[in-house]
Amino acid sequence: MLAPYACQPGESRGRQQPESMSTFRSPFQRDRDRIIHSSAFRRLKHKTQVFVEHEGDYYRTRLTHSIEVAQVARTISGVLGLNTDLAECIALAHDLGHTPFGHTGEDALAKLMEPYGGFDHNAQAMRIVTRLERHYAEFDGLNLTWESLEGIAKHNGPVEGPLPYALAEANAQWDLELHTYASAEAQVAAIADDVAYSHHDLHDGLRSGLFTEDDLMELPVTAPAFAEVDALYPGLEPMRRRHEALRRVFGRMVEDVIAVAQGRLEAAQPKSVEEIRQMGATVIRFSKPLYQELKVIRSFLFHRMYRAPSVMKERAKVTAVVNDLFPLFMRQPELLPQEWRRDVEAAEDETTLARIVADYVAGMTDRFALQEHARLCG
């Protein structure tokens, strides 16, 4: 049974293009399924976060990360009496707008797009689900419910200041109330992202040799976890020791979020999702002590992993790929695939063309971007 402050499927604000109700699935289940079956979601399999795709098969991709985020979101939302289908839907959609080569690719594309309104992966996710997916006979995009669109747009909180063009375009059509906080389900999806990447970046960094278990014995959160495992399982083989310690870190993060949320919900006693939106602060968050400890972990990961010499070397290589491909397609848009030509021919100015090229480049997988760069740029 859903809590009164959860998003109730029967009270959805609906879709831009009206559709008949499904016999077997709720509106949010249909949204989730449409995301899973989208081309953009499938492409996440070959988009990486930190490590370049061809570096190894073990490391997380955007797809595996999104699945992990969805799992965490379902767990937390279920305990809190929230709509698990909506939380899962937003979690699965949150990375759809990412470029090839992780944040490195986004930084390069954003710089190239500065004269044309900029580029932001969160806004690009909105552009994908409202415009770029073209599989349905009656509409462009996925025709998601208002609640799913709100969650994608605002899962990190109210959106203030100048809007990225993709988000401004969507908001003009749907009025996503960007000045308010999002539903609790969207807030859960956001913090599930924090939990998942903090956990798996520790895993991947250890696996890659960028740091060791001894390094983690010096840090908050991880040090107590390793100490507990060593006390319970003396002499445990290294891989099992690592896994047991990091699953405790993972568990502590999830349990902390649930405990804090339960306390805040009990204190506020919200009677509807609208009261959640108007609370003036997030209801789903880490406790202050754990948040401070996780800041230490993130600082460690930033210096030892995200800015490691081997990673920085790859950053330079893949930045060059984006920096070469974007201006090439701007000069010669006829190089774009046939299905993109209609949009190119309809482009009325350079800004519109740049946004089409950015859509195409952002949609590339790591592997395809490297292949196209080798083919077109030698």
UniProtKB/Swiss-Prot annotation:
Q: This protein's superkingdom?
A: Bacteria
Give the span(s) annotated as Disordered. Answer: 1-28
Q: Which family does it belong to?
A: Belongs to the dGTPase family. Type 2 subfamily.
NCBIfam families membership: dGTP_triPase (TIGR01353), PRK01286.1-1 (NF002326), PRK01286.1-3 (NF002328)
Keywords, in A-Z order = Hydrolase
Q: Tell me the ranges covered by the HD domain, including all copies.
A: 62-198
HAMAP family per UniProt: dGTPase_type2
The molecule here is called: Deoxyguanosinetriphosphate triphosphohydrolase-like protein
Residue ranges, compositional bias (Polar residues): 15-26
Q: Which InterPro entries does the annotation name?
A: dGTPase (IPR006261), dGTPase-like (IPR050135), dNTPase_2 (IPR023023), HD/PDEase_dom (IPR003607), HD_domain (IPR006674), PHydrolase_assoc_dom (IPR026875)
